[in-house]
UniProtKB/Swiss-Prot annotation:
Binds 1 zinc ion per subunit. Keywords: ATP-binding, Hydrolase, Membrane, Metal-binding, Metalloprotease, Mitochondrion, Mitochondrion inner membrane, Nucleotide-binding, Protease, Transmembrane, Transmembrane helix, Zinc. Zn(2+) binds at H509, H513, D587. Gene3D superfamilies: 1.10.8.60, P-loop containing nucleotide triphosphate hydrolases (3.40.50.300), Peptidase M41 (1.20.58.760). It comes from Caenorhabditis elegans. This is ATP-dependent zinc metalloprotease YME1 homolog. NCBIfam families: FtsH_fam. ATP-dependent metalloprotease that catalyzes the degradation of folded and unfolded proteins with a suitable degron sequence in the mitochondrial intermembrane region. Plays an important role in regulating mitochondrial morphology and function. It is an enzyme of class 3 (hydrolase). The chain crosses the membrane at residues 198-220. GO terms for molecular function: ATP binding; ATP hydrolysis activity; ATP-dependent peptidase activity; metal ion binding; metalloendopeptidase activity. In the N-terminal section; belongs to the AAA ATPase family. The keyword Transmembrane applies. One of its GO terms (biological process) is mitochondrial protein processing.
Length: 723
């Protein structure tokens, strides 16, 4: 009986011991603490004395009073929490602040019933059980739900107790109970209802914060930058004083600079134009191929205008949630209105301003562009705001976006001409250390078709290569190598591939391209030919125009087709039809595209006629439906095949009549790996190339690397002999 009593003593106070370990005390009156502890200790002590076989309790009332007083200092008990004890189908809840007991019972498929005992409830007499009676039932047979660890400890206690003599069992039991009371026993019931409520509240709070951050309603500032949401970046305002780019840094686009300089002048002195009745243009659209300097021009406007400047990208308006794209547009213009006069720059506007479509799958797809149209020129005018946008796909923009009143000025930024390239080379060469023998005009003539970004990359690549070689300055040789890198791609560092049979095939293939280009009247002039792998190709034949080309003739396009066919024809003539390789795949693809354009777009077929058939090609449609008659489609295919076959025959005639030159050029490529246009002409005329072969250069370099160690060895031997 004593062991059962001691066990239930530990079960009754296990939660009290746990709460006593977390001392989050608050300011409470000492008298209240003493009264609460005393009321609980009297009840517990009365229970123990009633059901103890021995008159003396293993725990004195003073010890219980101290434990309960410490537990009352807990923040949870101070906030009228409760101690829950689970027993089978019942829960005993003890509220220390009011010395009240609650007994809850839940049967199978019955609702929860709550009974109160103490100051906090007024239950009927039939529904209430006395706490002492309830505890006696527990001690009589019902077991308390404990954790697996508590059961194991109790089993160990019973086993150890039976091994001890009777005179030592009482002392062992007293020590076990005191340790249980001081450290607490795990597995106590907790305030589940309050814990669940707090957990749900915290989850709801975290969800609200995350959703607000997701949609941009809650904004976080990181340093000087304000981040609106996780997925939707905000338009960034640029401080004009922080922009170091001016119109002096913009080279090779004089006409475009003149257009935007008028807008900057208007922002600086609006009265100069308003007194004559002029109004500020609503928008400026920068149109041009990639790399021509559209974004650079926008940076220069920000540095010259000295007004608030907002920049964003068209892709930033694409939102995950419906309606967020339109909200982003409204937020952008709201910020701009507060800082007017100002400039808004939207890069790659084709992402948001493309043509509107009727899509039943996504009926809200046009909300963003509709909001942009309304903000630029809707019912409410936005005075003092200029929208500058850049795109290289102007044909994809919606017509409503291009009308006057929205984009009043369209500025074309083309590739630089010869004078523009000279100006750009002078600008970037001034930023590096180079030799005095570099002529920017020569570089400009040899870089026809280069954009400003290509020239910047070319000069930078030359400087990096010179630094890698520990050179004192950048020479013309480094610039030529960098130009080839831009034109043909990076070369394989190890030179030609180790497969000599593949190198031989590549040499005859590239020699075929080269000879056809040399003996075709309107072909683009040859620049360089190589069998060193560059990029995805095993070899490359580079063409470089002598002057800027603004349009192409039919003869020039046919000559280009002939040059493309030269590689495949060379393989067939040298190795046979069964030994042709896949090296001509890219040539055939480009030749087919050019032939299709000649027949379907440019009207260069007499049988097809002067008609554009590209209107039938709707690449964005899920199902392509052609309005062409079957006879017309067959005629177009026949004409495309005819153009390609005639080009193949012309290339074959050239290579059949130039077999000797073809053989000499292929052998020279196998020996020297790379040949310039002048060297090619010397080879086919029977002259020798006056430079060492790559194999000789490699051998010489190996000799030089071994020479210092040999000299050092001789020096050591000589010094050893003198000793």
């Amino acid at each position: 009986m004593q062991s059962a009593i001691n066990l239930n003593i530990g079960g009754l106070l296990q939660n009290t011991g746990l709460l006593r370990n977390s001392r989050n005390g608050i300011n409470r009156k000492p008298l209240d603490i003493e009264a609460t502890a005393a009321s609980l200790s009297r009840v517990y002590h009365q229970v123990w004395r009633q059901f103890s076989s021995d008159t003396s309790s293993p725990v004195t009332i003073n010890q219980m009073n101290n434990i309960l007083r410490d537990s009352t200092l807990s923040r949870r008990i101070a906030r009228k929490s409760e101690i829950s004890l689970n027993y089978d189908d019942a829960v005993v809840r003890i509220i220390p602040a009011s010395s009240s007991f609650y007994i809850q019972r839940r049967g199978f498929r019955t609702r929860k019933q709550t009974f109160g005992v103490g100051n906090a409830g007024k239950p009927t007499q039939d529904e209430v059980k006395s706490p002492l009676t309830y505890f006696s039932e527990l001690l009589a047979g019902k077991k308390q739900k404990t954790s697996e660890g508590g059961v194991e400890k109790w089993n160990q206690y019973e086993s150890d107790l039976k091994k001890l003599p009777e005179n030592q069992q009482r002392t062992y039991t007293d020590g076990f109970v005191k340790g249980l009371l001081s450290n607490g026993v795990s597995g106590a019931g907790k305030d589940g209802k309050k814990s669940n409520t707090l957990t749900r509240f915290y989850i709801f709070l975290v969800f609200c914060i995350f959703f607000g951050y997701l949609t941009g309603r809650i904004r976080v500032r990181v340093g000087d930058r304000q981040i609106g949401s996780l997925f939707f970046s905000n338009p960034q305002e640029v401080n004009p004083e922080d922009v170091q780019v001016t119109f002096d840094d913009v080279r090779g686009m004089d006409e475009a600079k003149l257009e935007v300089e008028e807008i900057v002048d208007y922002l600086k002195d609006p009265e100069k134009y308003s007194r004559l009745g002029g109004r500020l243009p609503k928008g400026v659209l920068l149109v041009g191929p990639p790399g021509t300097g559209k974004t650079l021009l926008a940076r220069a406007i920000a540095g010259e205008a000295q007004v608030p400047f907002f920049h964003t990208a068209g892709s930033e308006f694409d939102e995950v949630l419906v309606g967020q794209g339109a909200r982003r547009v409204r937020d952008l213009f709201d910020k701009a209105k507060a800082r007017a006069p100002c400039i808004i720059f939207i890069d790659e506007i084709d992402s948001v301003g493309s043509k509107r479509v009727s899509n039943s799958i996504h009926p809200y797809a046009n909300q963003t562009i509709n909001q942009l149209l309304s903000e630029m020129d809707g019912f409410t005018r936005n005075e003092g705001i200029i929208v500058i946008a850049a795109t290289n796909r102007v044909d994809d923009l919606d017509k409503a976006l291009l009308r006057p009143g929205r984009f009043d000025v369209r500025v074309t930024v083309p590739k630089p001409d010869l004078a523009g390239r000279v100006d750009i080379f002078n600008f970037y060469l001034s930023k590096i250390v180079h030799s005095g023998g570099i002529d920017p005009k020569v570089l400009a003539k040899g870089s026809t078709g280069f954009t400003g970004a290509d020239i910047e990359n070319m000069v930078n690549q030359a400087a990096l290569k010179a630094a890698t070689d520990n050179a004192v300055e950048v020479t013309m040789a480094y610039l030529d190598e960098a130009r080839d890198r831009v034109l043909m791609g990076p070369a394989r560092t190890g030179g030609r591939i180790p497969d000599e049979e593949a190198n031989r095939n590549t040499a005859y293939h590239e020699a075929g391209h080269t000879l056809v280009s040399l003996y075709t009247k309107d072909a683009t002039p040859l620049h360089k030919v190589t069998i060193i792998p560059r990029g995805q190709s095993l070899g490359h034949t580079a063409m470089l125009p002598e002057k800027d080309s603004y349009q192409l003739t039919k003869a020039q396009m046919l000559a280009t087709l002939d040059v493309m066919m030269g590689g495949r024809v060379a393989e067939e003539l040298i190795f046979g039809d069964d030994k042709v390789t896949t090296g001509a795949a890219d040539d055939l693809s480009k030749a087919t595209q050019l032939a299709v354009q000649m027949v379907k777009v440019f009207g260069m077929s007499d049988k097809v006629g002067l008609r554009d058939f590209t209107a039938q090609d709707n690449e964005s449609a899920l199902v392509k439906v052609s309005d062409l008659a079957p006879q017309t489609a067959e005629l177009i295919d026949a004409e495309i095949n005819r153009v390609l076959q005639e080009s193949y025959k012309r290339a074959k005639v050239i290579l059949e009549t130039k077999k000797k030159e073809h053989q000499l050029l292929a052998e020279a490529l196998l020996e020297y790996e790379t040949l310039s246009a002048d060297e090619v002409k010397r080879v086919i005329s029977g002259q020798k190339i006056k430079r060492p072969t790559p194999a000789a250069v490699k051998k010489s370099n190996e000799t030089k690397r071994n020479q210092p160690s040999l000299v050092l060895h001789l020096f050591e031997e000589e010094g050893r002999g003198k000793q």
